[in-house]
């Protein structure tokens, strides 16, 4: 209510709805307000997730105090926002206007995704060394499978997140809201995102390989156990057979 009274801006009731259609997430109102709803990654170790953020930007209606002010609505703090605030304090001239703020947020989100991918590489390298060592128990294999599955989930979230960032940046470029320098920066962000796509694809292949290798070691261990039981059964067969023969009653067998 305060925002509407002071800035003349109405926050849509469905600002945080989980819409999938692009037309419902990136659009321009008749009054010139730009609406962008985009997801930002939180690579939490225990609960990785994406957070929906809604942005509203008035670039045309100079009669309102909201002119040139970027409004953001989100349910929790996002690492990318904290990172940009820190950079802005260190370099006051970094953000020249609201459009630059929005663009830098998407740039930082792509950078954050890249850093998270590097962390996934490190985690998978540790798992790979353990699996390929050949000395893996079932308990160790179970832990490795759990670790690999968590990295697969995070990798999938990154892939979806950068896809969403690409759509948001492309919308900003199509809306003709960026100056020449900002437009070139947006193109660079898209190039960075394209490079991340190949990394996520490679990680999916590596994850599948490690999962297959781990499951293979589990099967080998199980086959060893079955073989031990089979040998034990054969070794115990003669005494069992003799005991059975001695336990038979031959008196009423006509063949004898």
Q: What are these regions, as identified by a protein language model?
A:
Residues 1-174, 178-179, 188, 192-195, ...:
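Peripheral, non-transmembrane regulatory/ligand-interaction domains of membrane transport proteins
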Residues 138-139, 176-182, 247, 252-255:
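Conserved catalytic-core motifs characterized by acidic clusters
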Residues 168-183, 210-221:
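Long amphipathic alpha-helical coiled-coil segments
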Residues 194-256:
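Hydrophobic alpha-helical transmembrane segments and their immediately adjacent juxtamembrane loops
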